[in-house]
Amino acid sequence: MKKVLIAGVTSGSGKTTAVLGILKALNEKYTIQSYKVGPDYVDTKFHTRITNRPTRNLDNYLVPDPQVLNYLFTANTENIDLGIIEGVMGLYDGLGTDKDAYSTASIAKQLNIPVILVINARATSTSAAAILKGFIDFDKKVPIKGVIINNVMSENHYKLIAGAIHRYLDLPILGYLPHDSTISLPSRQLGLVPDDELPNVDKKIAKVAEDVKAHVDLQKLLSLATSVSEKVVDPFNIPKTRLRLGIAKDKAFNFYYADNIHLLEKTGIELIPFSPISDNHLPDVDALYFGGGYPEEFASRLAANEFLKKEVYEFSQANKPIYAECGGLMYLGKVLKQGENEFPMVGIFDGMSEMTPRLKRFGYCEAYTQVDCMLGNRGQKIVGHEFHHSMFKQLDQQLKPVLLMKKVRDNQIVDTWSGGYQIRKTFASYLHVHFYQNPKLFIQFLNNLGADVQ
């Protein structure tokens, strides 16, 4: 497999647009595995829509062991021609001010992936060359090999910028993408609106692909891609087990890392999908798994499905294991509030999720278990990330948080809070967790779900 990383100078540079167009243009001829740097769930779905292959996240905060991350990058790539990695934010943006703290640049260096920068050309000409020179000089170990100029207003505008880059830099220009307001993808509180909620998304992607074919030198891009080194042996040697795990999968619940799903299945877990929106009954399973998503967008339909809410509540009452992240916590609470509207949810946890106009939590965080719970025994450290526009409030003060949360930036604790709740064998929190962070932690998690892994 050849590999190449598309990174932005800043957020909003157009890297997602460029990646979607490149994926669509090359997918007609090549077998492509796409990746996304960082913890994002939504962009990956757009990739998968094009490639028909689960997109994988590359995150060296959530997966701190370099050998494990290298394995996740190279696994199952025997029949792949090209790996295309989309960066996150700007190239050097990560956690705090350290350019190597979980940034796209740190991934490029760690996995030795050549970088193609995307720069927004709006209202600039020669200054684009200065910006690019700054990016190249800022860290010479980052293999920046080319640039795509986005949001170009005219052919003359492109020639002006390209001329400046050629004059001051020895950096290949792969081409440009013209300004086109009709191809922009709408956003909401957690980033882009998911692809399956956009009726014209395929037309927009096709239009970007046409622009890529017309104005970007794809052969030059392919020539800059380098080969992946030999495959890494899976460092997670988890014994096989057997368990039927019901997994909530519909428009309200769909935030799952492809590698988490793969690891569960590889361990012998049988995943049985069900829809909290439309199914009247739970499948015959040993445990339940609710990922994140957008329950607030489908609150009325979730609230109206009394049959399934009752079965989920009774599942918990029967002391069967339930694990829930973010949107799953909102669903398992008593009420989901949006403005003046209150929607009754499952009611396992006597608390209310209330939507807020601004992000309440955003980014990487550390969780420390205060009691034995689904995620681990007391005193266990778990890394993850939170990203939500809601707050969960206990309606009964007997409901106590089981996690102490910390945000650490530049080696300083900048925020602490409490979160996560467990009643019987039901656990829910706002924390999103990557299962590949710690094999012992994962084995303990499986056993808490009801598996028997020694």
Curated annotation (Swiss-Prot):
Organism this protein belongs to: Limosilactobacillus reuteri (strain DSM 20016) (Lactobacillus reuteri)
Domain notes from UniProt: Comprises of two domains. The C-terminal domain contains the binding site for glutamine and catalyzes the hydrolysis of this substrate to glutamate and ammonia. The N-terminal domain is anticipated to bind ATP and cobyrinate and catalyzes the ultimate synthesis of the diamide product. The ammonia produced via the glutaminase domain is probably translocated to the adjacent domain via a molecular tunnel, where it reacts with an activated intermediate.
Marked site (Increases nucleophilicity of active site Cys) residue numbers: 432
Domain of life: Bacteria
Catalytic activity, reaction form: cob(II)yrinate + 2 L-glutamine + 2 ATP + 2 H2O = cob(II)yrinate a,c diamide + 2 L-glutamate + 2 ADP + 2 phosphate + 2 H(+)
Pfam families in the cross-refs: CbiA (PF01656), GATase_3 (PF07685)
Cofactor entry: Mg(2+)
UniProt family annotation: Belongs to the CobB/CbiA family.
Designated name of the protein: Cobyrinate a,c-diamide synthase
Domain annotation GATase cobBQ-type: ranges: 244-440
EC category: ligase
Keywords: ATP-binding, Cobalamin biosynthesis, Glutamine amidotransferase, Ligase, Magnesium, Nucleotide-binding
CDD domains linked to this entry: GATase1_CobB
Note: The a and c carboxylates of cobyrinate are activated for nucleophilic attack via formation of a phosphorylated intermediate by ATP. CbiA catalyzes first the amidation of the c-carboxylate, and then that of the a-carboxylate.
Gene: cbiA
GO biological process: cobalamin biosynthetic process
NCBIfam families (UniProt xref): cobB, PRK01077.1
Function of the protein: Catalyzes the ATP-dependent amidation of the two carboxylate groups at positions a and c of cobyrinate, using either L-glutamine or ammonia as the nitrogen source.
Pathway where this protein functions: Cofactor biosynthesis; adenosylcobalamin biosynthesis; cob(II)yrinate a,c-diamide from sirohydrochlorin (anaerobic route): step 10/10
Sequence intervals crossing the membrane: none
ATP-binding is among the record's keywords: yes
One function term, GO molecular function aspect: ATP binding
Entries under SUPFAM superfamilies matching the protein: Class I glutamine amidotransferase-like, P-loop containing nucleoside triphosphate hydrolases
Active-site residues per Swiss-Prot or TrEMBL entry: 326 (nucleophile)
Enzyme Commission designation: 6.3.5.11
